[in-house]
């Protein structure tokens, strides 16, 4: 399985899910995949491989120890939310459509309640990336591991030398699940200034802090609901209210830095 646990998702997904559950419990949302390589063609085998991995998502479990880890580390979200998440039917295959269009380009849409559908994105993306790599013959067993690890160590050494703090945000763009494990193992062992991991599964596996707060998608949703004039302000206001000022890293580049800073002065 490419996705190994119900905890293998990015931190900000639980934050945004909880916000939407509190503010828009009945709102339905549609996500649409956009390949940033327009014109790239796939075959039916790729579609079947995607569907197989998507089917496996519904089989994922969240163990009691993982849930306890999440309750402790997501201290700004009430514990009952993770009790709900442990048993919720998040990855219902009836919510997703995958197909090839008339140009053999990959298409994917997911529709469900907003606080559920958000989890799909950062599982679909690593599945797509790994299967695409396999389709092109780029697999872990064929890579030059020593050369690749040397590149990782160069970045770690740079961080250590200059005391540069960083977080690991590799899930959505990773080469493969096995490779993320390898990289995170080295970061854990050698990096002095890694402050956290956005992949909760990896953070739990390695005993790291979780890292991350929100994504552009939440501002996009608010702008769709309230319009551009009010959406940014409402998003920041609700975020601060729901989390009582915690989870306080806010994105300022969705509609422009000047507009974002202006909205902060009116809270």
Question: What are the language-model segments listed below?
Answer:
Residues 1-231, 240-241:
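Ordered alpha/beta subdomains of enzyme catalytic regions
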Residues 236, 242-267:
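Catalytic core of soluble alpha/beta enzymes
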């Amino acid at each position: 399985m490419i996705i190994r646990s119900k905890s293998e998702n990015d931190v900000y997904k639980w934050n945004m899910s909880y916000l939407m559950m509190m503010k828009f419990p009945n709102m339905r949302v549609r996500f649409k995949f956009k390949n940033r390589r327009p014109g790239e063609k796939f075959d039916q085998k790729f579609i079947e491989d995607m569907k197989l991995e998507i089917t496996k998502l519904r089989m994922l479990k969240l163990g009691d120890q993982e849930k306890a880890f999440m309750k402790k580390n997501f201290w700004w979200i009430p514990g009952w939310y993770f009790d709900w998440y442990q048993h919720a039917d998040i990855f219902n295959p009836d919510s997703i459509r995958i197909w090839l269009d008339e140009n053999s380009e990959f298409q994917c849409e997911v529709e469900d309640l907003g606080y559920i559908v958000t989890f799909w994105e950062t599982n679909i993306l690593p599945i797509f990336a790994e299967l695409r790599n396999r389709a092109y013959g780029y697999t872990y067993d064929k890579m030059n591991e020593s050369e690749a690890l040397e590149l990782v160590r160069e970045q770690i050494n740079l961080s250590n030398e200059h005391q540069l703090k960083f977080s690991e945000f590799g899930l959505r763009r990773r080469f493969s699940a096995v490779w993320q494990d390898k990289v995170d193992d080295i970061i854990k062992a050698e990096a002095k200034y890694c402050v956290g991991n956005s992949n909760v599964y990896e953070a739990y596996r390695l005993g790291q802090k979780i890292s991350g707060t929100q994504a552009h998608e939440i501002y996009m949703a608010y702008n769709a609901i309230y319009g551009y004039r009010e959406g940014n302000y409402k998003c920041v206001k609700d975020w601060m209210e729901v989390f009582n000022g915690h989870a306080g890293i806010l994105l300022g580049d969705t509609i422009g830095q000047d507009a974002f800073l202006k909205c902060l002065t009116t809270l």
